[in-house]
Amino acid sequence: MRKKWLTGALAAFFISGMIPMTLWADTTDSDELTVTDVTLIDDGETVSENEEETEAAGGYLRTTDDMDVPSLSEEDGSEALLRDAEVPSVYNPKASGFTGGYTLPAVRNQNPYGTCWAFASLASSELSLLRSYQTSEDLSELQLAYFTYHSSTDPLGGTEGDSVSCVSDAYPNYLNLGGNYNFSVVSMMNWIGAADETAVPYSKAAATLSSGLDASYEYSYDVAHLQNYYRINIKTDPQEVKKAIMEYGAVGVSYLDRLLAYSYSTNAYYNNTTSGDGHAVTIVGWDDAFSRTNFGSDSSDQPSADGAWLIRNSWGSDDMSRNGYFWMSYADASLSNAAYVFLAEPADNYDHNYQYDGSILSSNLN
């Protein structure tokens, strides 16, 4: 294919309105961004005496971008391309007889680290590649997580003087610092990955805590690029979210995980509170007729209406899911407003990426 030149990338990389949560940093003389004070991200759900322990790890840090999402208008850009699609009442790629023309990739497992944000971002990217380019990729979550927190100057030198370094003496495990879709978007649009899983396998995660990763893995092993992304308000524009799933395979969302909100007998989740641990997942389907009674035997534990999203998790095949998937009520109170659509392309789409911003956030700086 004829290769092109990518210019003016800086404008797409700005992040604004970050809520001060757990990540704080100081600027140094070399303009390096260093993590200096970090609140621990628990590996599992905080449970009461009536709840069983779970080993599943969370780690999603919500921002205002997750909640403040405008409704779509007729003048919106790429979103408007989805409006002609007819939306069925059921869309389930896991069901036998599914006619969508693709098969979902194998379920991943983030255990035991708080890297759900990387897993959900790359799951959406993998499905985007599958739907748009019929390309099956297993992208490296470890490469994305590591170089999001350990970045250096890009190959063309545009980000010289900018870097991100994780140096918290109180909690040096970058894998449990948490993250969000904004972090993933900025890293991936900087062409930090996405690399193939075979190049930087997740099985080496523990070793990176002491020995790190060779710098060559930051920019030299990419097999896919994040070309664009956008957000849809899943609460006000659920039909547009469904159209995006049909076209691109998945959307990334976050919610607050509570063990008691999950029904093991029906594989259904409904959190009617705004408490729990932040967790990122992908939505790959839906069922408008999924009964509200599946979410609890008591009417007080049930949503007011039928309908559920088909959630792809990253906790392996049997942790609060069946074969890595579960159903979440449309009415879940903890579900973030933003559904993130990742538009990935094969890595040979452009020759160069001219950029000047090597940070991962633009606020929370002391």
Question: What does each of the following model-derived ranges do?
Answer:
Residues 1-2:
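N-terminal secretory signal peptides that target proteins for export/translocation
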Residues 5-24:
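Sec-dependent N-terminal signal peptides of Gram-positive bacterial secreted proteins and lipoproteins
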Residues 95, 112, 117-126, 145-298, ...:
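Predominantly the structural core of cysteine protease catalytic domains
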